[in-house]
Amino acid sequence: MIERTFIAENVSETLIDEYFKGKLVRAGYSHLELKKTPIGTRITVFAEKPGFVIGRKGKMVKELTDTLTEVYKVENPQIEVKPLETPDLDPAIVGHKIAASLEKGMHFRKTAHSAVRRVMAAGAKGVAIIISGKLSGERSRTEKFMDGYMKHCGEPAEELVIKSHQLAKLKLGIVGVTVKIMRPDVSLPDEIIILSGEIKEVTEFSEVSQE
């Protein structure tokens, strides 16, 4: 019973996340956090432009609340909106901007290189942008753009790298955009930290008793 409830809650959160992605495009929607409370369900929405989530006179947030109640059967939803501190370190925001630029006709290489520079300028330890699909011809291909340090496999890649997948609808077809970012605050298992300061030589003597 507990397992079924857990699965149902995760499915519900995934569906709500997909709904927000489509509804809050202009707001620069990133992700949500859902938490059950004694008085209902608190949903924290993280977005680049919180004002668009709230809407004029609270119209948008009311629409979201009504949909959560009626369609997704969320008990007494309380929506809280929080701004992103550094949008260029959020893979969902970066990926969305790349997809939007591609849909406007910008060249994929110029768009990707520009995004890489912004992410690294924001302080990331590393970034990888992968664009796949029909980019300039009939044949599909994959282009990768990377800078800095990046873990691609194993436990560090799962725990230290945040990623997002976005889609761009072009005339030639659907193009996938994957963004992976290693944030500046992560500590790598094999990272060596050198502390600055004066190095003092210490010599110790010990007496050896002779019997």
From Swiss-Prot:
Molecular function terms from GO: rRNA binding; structural constituent of ribosome
Highest taxon in the source lineage: Archaea
Residue intervals of the KH type-2 domain: 16-85
Keywords: Ribonucleoprotein, Ribosomal protein, RNA-binding, rRNA-binding
InterPro entries: KH_dom (IPR004087), KH_dom-like_a/b (IPR015946), KH_dom_type_2 (IPR004044), KH_sf_prok-type (IPR009019), Ribosomal_S3_C_sf (IPR036419), Ribosomal_uS3_arc (IPR027488), Ribosomal_uS3_C (IPR001351), Ribosomal_uS3_euk/arc (IPR005703)
Known partners and oligomeric status: Part of the 30S ribosomal subunit.
Protein name: Small ribosomal subunit protein uS3
Organism whose genome encodes this protein: Methanococcus vannielii (strain ATCC 35089 / DSM 1224 / JCM 13029 / OCM 148 / SB)
